[in-house]
A protein has these predicted regions:
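Short, solvent-exposed loop/turn positions at domain surfaces
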Residues: 74-76, 94, 112, 146, ...
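Tandem repeat scaffolds
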Residues: 100-103, 118-121, 195
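Glycine-rich hexapeptide-repeat left-handed beta-helix
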Residues: 27-29, 39, 126-127, 132-235
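Periodic small-residue-enriched repeat registers in elongated scaffold domains
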Residues: 116-118, 139
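Terminal amphipathic alpha-helical/low-complexity segments used for targeting or macromolecular assembly
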Residues: 1-71, 215, 221, 230-232
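Conserved short histidine dyad/triad with adjacent acidic residue
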Residues: 62-64, 83, 195
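Glycine-rich active-site/cofactor-binding loop and its immediate structural neighborhood
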Residues: 76-115
Length: 235
């Protein structure tokens, strides 16, 4: 599937992943020829599902047993892999396959579902839920957040109650809106791609198919739709 050339690439949205020293632990490899959200395609040969399945299979066992910290796990569909330095709080629940990186935090009542890739120093906080998503190093979903079928760049912070909507009400293909035009993503479930250091205020919502460039800000109680460049302001 072809997408407009004007869509921001992974190198534009996540420059530290390409130019800085590699972070501790494991991070996914992003497409450079396809649209950045192609990694969310369920059957993509190098998509999130394929890469995470390969990653968790490379471990003989999880470096940390999260149940010793009071968490519960479900490995009926795949392993739950947690690095030894990660902080896992009581009452959290993790479903495999999933990966939690070095010094990441999974706080009380967090719900980490299948194909969640939580990179080093990322946070899934109290009453927050992730599913088929990537939180790059230092990304935070700390309080009452939902992150589904999405990518949060390094340094992204979601304010309390922020929700990333990933499914249209009619269940149809998610479309992206950019420069007054609308085009299909090829995905039925697609939340948002948030470039590095984006800040979303409390109780904000991103509609399905949002892409925000680096350092964008969303004010509290604001709903965002579309594709926007770096440093955009909403609300």
């Amino acid at each position: 599937m072809e997408w407009p050339d004007a869509l921001p690439s992974a190198m534009v949205l996540f420059p530290s992943m390409f130019h800085d020293s590699p972070p501790d632990g494991h991070c996914p490899t992003f497409p450079t020829a396809d649209a950045v959200f192609s990694i969310l395609q369920p059957n993509h040969p190098n998509g999130l599902k394929a890469q995470l399945t390969e990653l968790v299979a490379s471990f003989d066992a999880s470096p940390q047993n999260p149940t010793l910290s009071g968490a519960t796990i479900d490995e009926s569909a795949g392993p739950v892999i947690v690095e030894q330095s990660a902080q896992i709080e009581p009452g959290s629940h993790l479903i495999g396959p999933c990966y939690v990186g070095h010094h990441a935090e999974i706080r009380h009542a967090a719900y980490v579902r299948q194909f969640s890739w939580i990179c080093s120093e990322a946070v899934v906080g109290h009453a927050s839920e992730t599913k088929h998503s990537i939180l790059l190093p230092g990304a935070k979903a700390p309080h009452f957040n939902y992150v589904g079928d999405s990518i949060l760049g390094t340094g992204v912070n979601l304010g309390a109650g922020t929700k990333i909507s990933n499914l249209r009400n009619d269940g149809g293909e998610v479309h992206l809106r950019m420069n007054g035009e609308r085009f299909g993503s090829g995905l039925r479930k697609f939340g948002a791609v948030l470039g590095e250091r984006c800040q979303l205020g409390c109780n904000s919502v991103t509609n399905p198919g949002v892409i925000l460039g680096c350092d964008s800000q969303v004010h509290p109680n604001t709903t965002v739709t579309g594709v926007f460049p770096a440093d955009s302001r909403h609300g």
